[in-house]
């Protein structure tokens, strides 16, 4: 007798349910509560694709705390042109549950979403600039720069490393190694200069009294944001050509 692992049991149960739903002609809404366990590394992508396929002709609601699975859902939904309504249920700062936000949390957002958020936040900083004290302005620009720095890091992982090595299965995709061959020295210099600049702006370490630090102006911030967006477009192009 063979005993199924927890992940295999979850996958088998989900497969049975999806088969049953497939033959249901009512097209009623389907709700999944954390359909993938942490053990289902090799099945996440297949399950996400099947759930998205189901969502093409009925409402599908998915509750999950698995960010990798969420990423797979979004990826397959984009491929299939299936619209997504983003919502996050979380606790407030006093640990009371039930706060609902009409977007994914920052750590779950992809590079494109983060870039859009950073552009909106920069517009607010520009608008408030003249009414802020030096310290208040430095705090706002430091937080913004920290998130831009994180977006660079996310881009390197998601658009370079994870395209070559599947993080859920650790499978290496040899053909996509071509992405690395297309990255030029200019690309590296662009990344290094921008990442170094925004890391300096971010409040990660105490600024020495001997170092006369001046927070970046909005034009400098916009330049670095545009540099990231252009780098992202180039690296996506490399991936599409591989």
What positions do the PLM features span?
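Catalytic acidic motif of RecA-like/P-loop NTPases
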Residues: 22, 36-37
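C-terminal intrinsically disordered, low-complexity extensions immediately downstream
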Residues: 181-210
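Conserved D-loop/post-Walker B switch-helix segment of ABC ATPase nucleotide-binding domains
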Residues: 27, 41-49
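Conserved ABC ATPase signature
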Residues: 1-16, 37-39
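Catalytic Walker B motif of ABC-type/P-loop ATPase nucleotide-binding domains
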Residues: 26-34
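C-terminal lobe/lid and adjacent interdomain/linker elements of RecA-like ASCE P-loop ATPase modules
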Residues: 46-159, 169-187, 191, 222-229, ...
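Charge-enriched, short contiguous segments at helix-coil
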Residues: 201-242
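Extended helical coiled-coil dimerization/tether regions that scaffold
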Residues: 1-3, 19, 23-26
């Amino acid at each position: 007798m063979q005993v199924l692992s927890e992940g295999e049991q979850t996958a088998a149960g989900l497969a049975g349910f999806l088969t049953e739903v497939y033959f249901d002609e009512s097209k009623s809404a389907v709700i999944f509560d954390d359909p993938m366990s942490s053990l289902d590394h090799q099945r996440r992508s297949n399950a996400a694709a099947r759930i998205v396929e189901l969502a093409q002709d009925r409402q599908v609601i998915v509750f999950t705390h698995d960010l990798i699975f969420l990423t797979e859902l979004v990826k397959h939904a984009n491929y299939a042109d299936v619209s997504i309504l983003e919502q996050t249920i979380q606790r407030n700062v006093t640990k009371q549950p039930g706060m609902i936000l009409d977007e994914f949390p920052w750590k779950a957002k992809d590079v494109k979403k983060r870039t859009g958020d950073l552009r909106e936040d920069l517009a607010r900083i520009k608008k408030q600039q003249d009414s802020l004290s030096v310290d208040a302005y430095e705090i706002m620009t430091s937080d913004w720069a920290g998130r831009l720095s994180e977006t660079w890091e996310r881009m390197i992982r998601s658009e370079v490393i994870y395209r070559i090595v599947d993080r859920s299965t650790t499978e290496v995709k040899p053909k996509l190694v071509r992405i690395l061959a297309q990255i030029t020295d200019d690309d590296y210099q662009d990344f290094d200069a921008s990442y170094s600049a925004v890391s300096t702006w971010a409040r990660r370490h105490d600024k020495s009294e001997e170092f006369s630090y001046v927070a970046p102006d909005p034009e400098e911030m916009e330049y670095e944001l545009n540099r990231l967006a252009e780098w992202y477009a180039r690296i996506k192009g490399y991936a599409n050509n591989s």
